[in-house]
Amino acid sequence: GLSFDVLLKRIFRQDPDIIMIGEIRDAKTAELAVRAALTGHLVFSTLHTDNAVESVMRLEDLGVPPYLISAVLRGVISQRLIRRVCTECGGAGCEACAHTGGKGRIAVAEIFPIDDSFAEAVYTHASPRELYRQRKQKGLPSMYEDACAKMRQGIITPQEIARVLG
């Protein structure tokens, strides 16, 4: 039969340089993505996690051993979309924003490039707390910190941060 993993295997045979997998939902897809990355393909995909560090934990939950995660993972971007403050009325509500105070959305994100020290931490099965500590030590802002910076610029509201990031 024609399944997702069969289609992925067929794509791999075409020897593309870059492969985009819409979402890694199960162990089989995770295994195929890792195998593709190990053979020199640049693989992009999505995972349902709350932040960048949890993406590593999710791959482990899907059965990818830490030594393989550390070998193939090059970076993680985690994002959420938050409603922007309407630029016409400053959030008070007007016809341009249908009296909601917000118009459009903007991403709040955390970007986590994987360097040697982080790969080593993953390889040695470091705790999530240690991975968060490394992120902070490198000066990489969390998604919450990115949201707060956008709030200070007047782009989003504290209420939206609370609604989306909890």
Could you say what each language-model-derived stretch is?
Residues 1-166:
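Short, flexible helix-loop junctions that flank or precede catalytic/ligand sites
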